[in-house]
A protein has these predicted regions:
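An N-terminally biased module of ancient metal coordination in phosphate/nucleic-acid-related enzymes
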Residues: 1-90, 94, 164-173, 231-237, ...
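Structural preference for beta-strand elements that scaffold enzyme active sites
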Residues: 7-11, 40-42, 81-87, 110-113, ...
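Acidic (Asp/Glu)-rich catalytic clusters
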Residues: 2-9, 34-35, 68-81, 100-113, ...
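Short, acidic/polar
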Residues: 22-32, 95-103, 138-145, 178
Length: 275
């Protein structure tokens, strides 16, 4: 076991009540980050989208300044104790690129997650035909397109679609499509997330699972870990398990984004830093 070291990791994926399905004020999330032995926290609440795109699970465009102010309030309150940063989780689907490009330029952001949320109504209405396997293929095609768009730092929970119908998730069958998508993603340099909240979903394992993570490692795709916290007590949850899973897949480093620049951290050092 490595000797304890100073805090170095960040919670790189967490939310605020503005998304309508998270609870707790930013300051409460910050308190849990300190208890977990984290150096900082990057709020990445669900970004507003045009035309009422799944408005029930995200802030409105009019609330965006309020979101920025909430994070700034927490940053000021924890100055000198915890590094609090502003980010976003932005949904990707073809056609949203112009909106997202303009949104991401409004304020300085530190980490921009790109997500394909197969379960939201607007996405399902456009892409689900009733064929689950075809939907899985579409999901990976859109992940690759998200990376190629240049809009995102990290692709979040990048096998989320397996929860659409766990009984119809057979990785050997989808693997050729996954590999083609990962080849395209690797060519962009965009990172991918190991999301610990997958353990709480219908198919209870990390997002992605071990098989996909190994394919990512083979291609040298950088990884960021995040808990996808929608309540304060989930900040930093499962980080030690995630780091060991990365090691088992062949990774030696984990990454943090600050100022939208990727900073690698040795996994052994990261493990030693956790409370």
């Amino acid at each position: 076991m490595p000797a304890a070291s100073a805090p170095i990791l960040y919670e790189s994926h967490c939310h605020t009540p503005l998304c309508k399905h998270a609870v707790g004020e930013p300051e409460e999330y910050c308190e849990h980050a300190l208890r977990r032995g984290l150096r900082g926290i990057i709020f990445t609440c669900h970004a507003p989208l045009p035309h009422g795109w799944s408005a029930d699970v995200r802030m409105t465009d009019a609330q965006f300044p309020e979101y920025v102010a909430m994070v700034e309030r927490a940053r000021a309150a924890y100055a000198g104790r915890l590094d609090v940063r502003l980010g976003l989780e932005s949904d990707y689907a073809p056609g949203l690129e112009p909106w997202l490009e303009a949104l991401h330029r409004r304020v300085p952001l530190h980490h921009v997650l790109g997500s394909v949320h197969y379960q939201v109504r607007f996405y399902r209405e456009r892409y689900f035909t009733g064929d689950v396997f075809a939907y899985q293929q579409t999901y990976y095609e859109h992940l690759a397109q998200a990376a190629e768009s240049g809009l995102f730092d990290t692709l979040s929970h990048p096998d989320l679609v397996k929860n659409e119908s766990p009984a119809e998730w057979h990785f050997p069958r989808i693997r050729p499509y996954v590999e083609r998508a990962l080849d395209r993603i690797a060519a962009t340099g965009v990172a991918m997330e190991l999301n610990t909240s997958g353990r709480l979903k219908s198919l209870a394992e990390m997002n992605p699972g071990a098989a996909q993570l190994a394919l990512m490692a083979e291609r040298g795709i950088p990884v960021v870990i995040g808990a996808d916290a929608h309540r304060p007590d989930r900040v930093g949850d499962g980080y030690a398990t995630a780091l060991r899973m990365l090691q088992e897949a062949g990774y030696r480093e984990v990454n943090v984004f600050l100022d939208r620049r990727r900073h690698p951290v040795p996994i052994e050092r990261a493990l030693a830093s956790l409370a």
